């Protein structure tokens, strides 16, 4: 039998699991910021700033006394790293291994934004190996055109090496990525074993349940290349195992967990208005 939730109950569950019931849910400062990113699974990075970048806004809404410098502190300590979730994001370093499948696909020849230029990537990699961490501005070659998305050969090589995992971002300088070799950035002891597809799907499902409270399998596989059918099958298997359960909200059936459903009614949402970023 499929249990059901009212729209109001579903909304309350999502707000609670998203950490929006209170600005003290995760604590404060860099420790609270780390806890928030680990709970949410990732926070999308915003390259544009009008009032504030979206990732700053997202964390400010959840972490008491949050400052943008808290992200810098965590990144330089190796507690979080940058890579691709459904978009460029800050991710918990504890989840590093779950980015390896995408890195492997790019390294095996799949294009992300640009077709790989092996000669250029070797040249860029050699400079960083010899000179240490560099930004794109440290390379003086020019882009091929003035169009919005045009990039210089070195910038394309940096992004390819970053997506492959050969380069990581130990810090940003005036929000420009600083690139360095993975072996000089990845903390010792981080699990770098390649997950199976089943492990990856289970990780994404557990992360979604923790951060959202309920979700469709299609939402959990959003922009995760090639995982749609496997995600649906893994979610169904987890229902059989008693890890997930099916929940109906209106005409739509979602997945949730007993633990999440037991949260209903335990906390009253804050009556304060929260203005959320469109990326949130």
Label each residue range with its predicted role.
Residues 1-274:
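Long, low-complexity intrinsically disordered regions
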Residues 276-280:
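Short, intrinsically disordered, charge-balanced linker/junction segments flanking boundaries
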């Amino acid at each position: 039998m499929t249990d059901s939730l009212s729209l109001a109950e579903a909304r309350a569950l999502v707000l609670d699991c998203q950490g929006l019931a209170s600005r003290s849910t995760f604590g404060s400062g860099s420790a609270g910021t780390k806890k928030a990113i680990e709970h949410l699974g990732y926070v999308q990075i915003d390259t544009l700033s009008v009032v504030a970048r979206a990732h700053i806004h997202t964390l400010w809404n959840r972490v008491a006394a949050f400052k943008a410098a808290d992200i810098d502190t965590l990144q330089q300590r190796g507690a979080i790293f940058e890579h691709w979730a459904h978009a460029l994001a800050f991710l918990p370093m504890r989840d590093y291994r779950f980015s390896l499948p995408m890195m492997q696909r790019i390294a095996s020849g799949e294009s992300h934004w640009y077709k790989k230029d092996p000669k250029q990537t070797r040249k860029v990699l050699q400079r960083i190996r010899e000179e240490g961490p560099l930004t794109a501005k440290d390379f003086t070659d020019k882009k091929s055109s003035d169009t919005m998305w045009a990039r210089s050969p070195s910038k394309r090589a940096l992004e390819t090496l970053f997506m492959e995992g050969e380069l990581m971002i130990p810090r940003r300088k005036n929000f420009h990525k600083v690139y360095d070799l993975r072996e000089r950035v990845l903390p010792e002891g981080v699990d770098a074993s390649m997950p199976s597809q089943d492990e990856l799907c289970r990780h994404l499902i557990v992360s979604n349940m923790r951060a959202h409270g309920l979700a469709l399998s299609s939402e959990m596989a959003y922009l995760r290349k090639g995982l749609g059918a496997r995600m649906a099958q893994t979610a169904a298997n987890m229902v059989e195992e008693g890890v997930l359960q099916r929940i109906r909200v209106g005409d739509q059936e979602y997945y949730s967990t007993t633990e999440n459903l037991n949260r209903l009614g335990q906390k009253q949402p804050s009556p304060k208005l929260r203005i959320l970023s469109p990326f949130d």
